[in-house]
Amino acid sequence: MKVAVIGAAGGIGQALALLLKNRLPAGSDLALYDIAPVTPGVAADLSHIPTPVTIKGYAGEDPTPALEGADVVLVSAGVARKPGMDRADLFNVNAGIVKALAEKIAVVCPKACVGIITNPVNTTVPIAAEVLKKAGVYDKRKLFGVTTLDVIRSETFVAALKDKDPGQVRVPVIGGHSGVTILPLLSQVEGVSFTDEEVAALTKRIQNAGTEVVEAKAGGGSATLSMGQAACRFGLALVKALQGESDVVEYAYVEGEGEYAPFFAQPIKLGKNGVEALLDIGKLSAYEQAALDGMLDTLKGDIQIGVEFVK
């Protein structure tokens, strides 16, 4: 099993690489790529960790050696948010980066499962899809926007509020991966109940958690360590499913049946070919239904921007 981390010298990439070096199954290959010259050094550093995972790092303009033979590609390349920026501001730089990488993936490892971490995910995933379509290699079962960070934040915040073990809390999060498009389904959390005020406050905190970290880092970066953890969780789920483990369920932003929007974050069952089944989002509360209805125009607009970018 080969996993490639693209953008591996960045804050997310290094955290993700560290976690994967420790947690990938024995015998896995981990390839790191970044345009930054430090990348082979990051791999050298991680290679000293005594786990049965081989690691190589590649730098420069061409990601081909890292992508060759990859089963899973996790893309975190791009610029990070700074105070005052929203995820849309990132679009101007990151859209071109994702487009160029998708063009490489289409040629070098078209059958790989690709997880897009680079923001704005609502838009970068449709960009990758359009590029892969143009190349004639698009398989909607194998392209994912990694929204796991919204899920782990929700689990953490709910556990703290209700004094639960965060490892035992499960919170479905649907929609997209920025602002109002992030919708935690708090009515479906088992074993706890919330007042209307708690629901409103928690939902807002989950939607704005990225900004919370950007501001706390005071210009020194965005959410890199928690995102590395989230991407690792999703990457390991993909690896398990590809290796034949059954009943692997995660949340991700994928091309669905178009019931809500062309791409939508929802629970998915993973299998040997990526998405095995789209799972139902379940029954929503009146608050959640109103929030879902209210965000769809924003989400569809984000998707359309990505489609237009590739045309």
Curated annotation (Swiss-Prot):
Q: Which GO terms describe its biological process?
A: malate metabolic process; tricarboxylic acid cycle
Q: Which PANTHER family match?
A: MALATE AND LACTATE DEHYDROGENASE, MALATE DEHYDROGENASE, MITOCHONDRIAL
Q: Which residues form the signal peptide?
A: none
What family does the Swiss-Prot or TrEMBL record give for this protein?
Belongs to the LDH/MDH superfamily. MDH type 1 family.
CC per GO annotation: cytoplasm
Reported EC number(s) for this entry are 1.1.1.37
Q: NCBIfam families this protein is in?
A: MDH_euk_gproteo
Spell out the PROSITE patterns in the cross-references.
MDH (PS00068)
CDD domains tied to this protein: MDH_glyoxysomal_mitochondrial
Reaction(s) catalysed by this chain's protein: (S)-malate + NAD(+) = oxaloacetate + NADH + H(+)
Q: Which InterPro entries match?
A: L-lactate/malate_DH (IPR001557), Lactate/malate_DH_C (IPR022383), Lactate/malate_DH_N (IPR001236), Lactate_DH/Glyco_Ohase_4_C (IPR015955), Malate_DH_AS (IPR001252), Malate_DH_type1 (IPR010097), Malate_DH_type1_bac (IPR023958), NAD(P)-bd_dom_sf (IPR036291)
Which parts of the sequence bind NAD(+)?
G7, A8, A9, G10, G11, I12, G13, D34, N94, I117, T118, N119, M227
Q: What is this protein called?
A: Malate dehydrogenase
Role summary:
Catalyzes the reversible oxidation of malate to oxaloacetate.
Which keywords accompany this UniProt record?
NAD, Oxidoreductase, Tricarboxylic acid cycle
Species, as recorded: Vibrio cholerae serotype O1 (strain ATCC 39315 / El Tor Inaba N16961)
Record SUPFAM superfamilies: LDH C-terminal domain-like (SSF56327), NAD(P)-binding Rossmann-fold domains (SSF51735)
- The reply to whether Disulfide bond figures as a keyword in the UniProt entry is no
